[in-house]
Structure formats: structure tokens, C-alpha cells
């Protein structure tokens, strides 16, 4: 049986909030069977909980933000959510003492190492997957995203930026998902931004924590980071990282074939909502027989590195 997973112990880290520029303490806690992924703001009294849920995503302008019915929000959850998805974790409580998750280095890698440092523990209950049964597609102008039936989790993402530093032959990436491939090929890809956009955002009191330490920054001609890129195609890999985190807002790992062109947080969430709203398009599955598990989900996370 493929079992649910949580953390062996609690662990915490301190970082900077992307939008506030303020210090944020993040604590990750183990959680009982069937708890799911739950975000919590401990700076409020009483603390406010945000279970991972596609319908809780109500703002995708600059990041993925969860907003409850009272308008309370927690922002920038996508990179941590991607790390949780990548390692196949099912039950974790995430506490932050601020309105946003710390940005760290702009990738999912610091969260991966934090989770692995806490340790991953199997629980005595079957892990549930969402298996796609029918193709679902959403569009926004020339942008689109779709997911189709597939015995595993495969992703194909294409970006299209008219910029000298982003060549066309580095604008597409395909991944046959496994925890190991996620860690090695996707988790280190950092978020990116254009200098003109950062200057505008900071003039509006946003992205105050944004810097060359936590993002790839481009001017009109080149990448400004002294150390350059971690991968030649780091930008499209990061968009795939975002998509993995956005799709995991369902709270379950997905079995399906995801394809996207110029998609972002909003369209990814629209696709997930459209899938979940169509009862004929998906089903929950568990795997009692390990031999029948799709290959990408068969490798225990404990042996990743």
C-alpha cells in the first residue's frame, strides 16, 4: 500500500517576506492522517487556518494567495506548496507569523531541504491521488492550460517572452514527474522578474523584499544576477515549479498529463477548479498494490539525496 506521509518532527526557519520586506518565521509541523496541507497565520488572535483548497485561491496577481471568507489572506504559498507536492507529503501544518510565506532564495529548494531535514514519515493510511479521467482545457486569449488522463504525472510547459536573454529554444520544458527529478531538475529554479516591473511595484509599496538574492532579475537586454542562471532554461523550469505548486492546491498529488502555454498562477488555478467542478473528469484512487503505482510516485522520498 502507498501510504500517506507527514513529517517526523517540527522544524522552523526565518526568512524575508517578498512583499513586506519584513522578517517572517515559518514553522512546519507533522499532522495526523487525513489532515491535508493546512496553512496557518499565528500572528493573528485566534490563529487563522487556511486548508489547501482550489477555491481558497482568490488572488493570483503577483503570487498565489489564499483568502478566507473574512478577507484574511496568506500570500506567496506556491513555492512551499510545490516542495510539498514534489516530496509527496499529505499532512502538514504550516505556521507563519506574517501575512506571507518567506521567499527564501526564490525557488523551492530551501523548502525541500527543510522538509528533508525534518524527515518524512509514512502513516498508516492509504495515500489518495486525484486521477484525471477526461481532458479539461482552459484558455485566456492566446494562453492556455490543459490536463488529460495519464498513468503518472507528466508536464509540458512553454513560455513566450520577447526578450534577448530568453531564446526560443529554451522556452519549453517537459518533465516525467518523480520526486527525484523534481528535486534535481525543478526545485532550484528561481522566480524571475523584469527590473521595470520591480521598480513600479516597489513604488506602490510592493515587492519590498525582492532582490537579486531571491529572484532572477532582467533589464531590457540581459540577466543582472552576477552568478547568472542555475540552468540555461531556468525561467521555464520555474514556471513548471509554480504549476506543480498551483495544481497541488487540490491537496492531493495528481495523475494526469499537464500541458500549458504562457500559463500563470491564475490560469493554473482556473484549470484546477474546472477539473474538480466536473465530477465525471476525475476520481480519487489509492494503491494497495505497490506494483501498480505509477513509476514517478513509487520512489520513497527518503532516498532522494
Swiss-Prot record:
Record's catalysed reaction(s): a UDP-3-O-[(3R)-3-hydroxyacyl]-N-acetyl-alpha-D-glucosamine + H2O = a UDP-3-O-[(3R)-3-hydroxyacyl]-alpha-D-glucosamine + acetate
Keyword Metal-binding appears in the UniProt entry: yes
- Keywords of the record: Hydrolase, Lipid A biosynthesis, Lipid biosynthesis, Lipid metabolism, Metal-binding, Zinc
What top-level class of enzyme does the UniProt entry assign? hydrolase
Q: Which residues bind Zn(2+)?
A: 79, 238, 242
Domain of life assignment: Bacteria
Q: Which co-factors does it depend on?
A: Zn(2+)
**Molecular-function GO term, any one:** metal ion binding
Q: What is its EC number?
A: 3.5.1.108
Please provide, in alphabetical order, the Gene Ontology terms of the cellular component aspect for this entry.
membrane
Write out the GO biological process terms.
lipid A biosynthetic process
Q: In which pathway does it act?
A: Glycolipid biosynthesis; lipid IV(A) biosynthesis; lipid IV(A) from (3R)-3-hydroxytetradecanoyl-[acyl-carrier-protein] and UDP-N-acetyl-alpha-D-glucosamine: step 2/6
The cross-references to Gene3D superfamilies, in alphabetical order and at most eight, read: lpxc deacetylase, domain 1 (3.30.230.20), lpxc deacetylase, domain 2 (3.30.1700.10)
Catalytic residues at 265
- Say which family it is in: Belongs to the LpxC family.
- Its biological purpose: Catalyzes the hydrolysis of UDP-3-O-myristoyl-N-acetylglucosamine to form UDP-3-O-myristoylglucosamine and acetate, the committed step in lipid A biosynthesis.
The protein in question is named UDP-3-O-acyl-N-acetylglucosamine deacetylase
Amino acid at each position: 500500500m502507498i501510504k500517506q506521509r507527514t513529517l517526523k518532527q517540527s522544524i522552523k526557519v526565518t526568512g524575508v517576506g517578498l512583499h513586506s520586506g519584513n522578517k517572517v518565521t515559518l514553522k512546519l509541523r507533522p499532522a495526523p492522517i487525513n489532515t491535508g496541507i493546512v496553512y496557518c497565520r499565528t500572528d493573528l488572535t485566534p490563529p487563522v487556518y487556511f486548508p489547501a483548497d482550489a477555491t481558497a485561491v482568490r488572488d493570483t496577481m503577483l503570487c498565489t494567495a489564499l483568502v478566507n471568507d473574512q478577507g484574511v489572506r496568506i500570500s506567496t504559498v506556491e513555492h512551499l506548496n510545490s516542495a510539498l507536492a514534489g516530496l509527496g507529503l499529505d499532512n502538514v501544518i504550516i505556521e507563519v507569523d506574517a501575512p506571507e510565506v518567506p521567499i527564501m532564495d526564490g525557488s523551492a529548494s530551501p523548502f525541500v531541504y527543510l522538509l528533508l531535514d525534518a524527515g518524512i514519515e509514512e502513516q498508516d493510511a492509504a495515500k489518495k491521488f486525484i486521477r484525471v479521467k477526461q481532458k479539461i482545457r482552459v484558455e485566456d486569449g492566446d494562453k492556455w492550460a490543459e490536463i488529460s488522463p495519464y498513468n503518472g504525472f507528466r508536464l509540458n510547459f512553454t513560455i513566450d517572452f520577447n526578450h534577448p536573454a530568453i531564446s526560443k529554444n529554451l522556452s519549453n520544458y517537459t518533465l516525467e514527474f518523480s520526486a527525484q527529478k523534481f528535486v534535481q531538475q525543478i526545485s532550484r529554479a528561481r522566480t524571475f522578474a523584469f527590473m521595470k516591473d520591480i521598480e513600479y511595484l516597489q513604488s506602490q509599496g510592493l515587492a519590498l523584499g525582492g532582490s537579486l538574492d531571491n529572484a532572477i532579475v532582467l533589464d531590457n537586454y540581459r540577466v543582472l544576477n552576477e552568478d547568472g542562471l542555475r540552468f540555461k532554461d531556468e525561467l521555464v523550469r520555474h514556471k513548471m515549479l509554480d504549476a506543480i505548486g498551483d495544481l497541488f492546491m487540490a491537496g492531493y498529488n495528481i495523475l494526469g498529463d499537464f500541458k500549458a502555454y504562457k500559463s500563470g498562477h491564475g490560469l493554473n488555478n482556473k484549470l484546477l477548479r474546472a477539473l474538480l467542478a466536473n465530477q465525471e473528469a476525475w476520481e480519487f484512487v489509492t494503491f494497495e498494490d505497490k506494483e501498480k503505482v505509477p513509476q514517478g510516485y513509487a520512489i520513497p522520498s527518503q532516498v532522494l539525496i
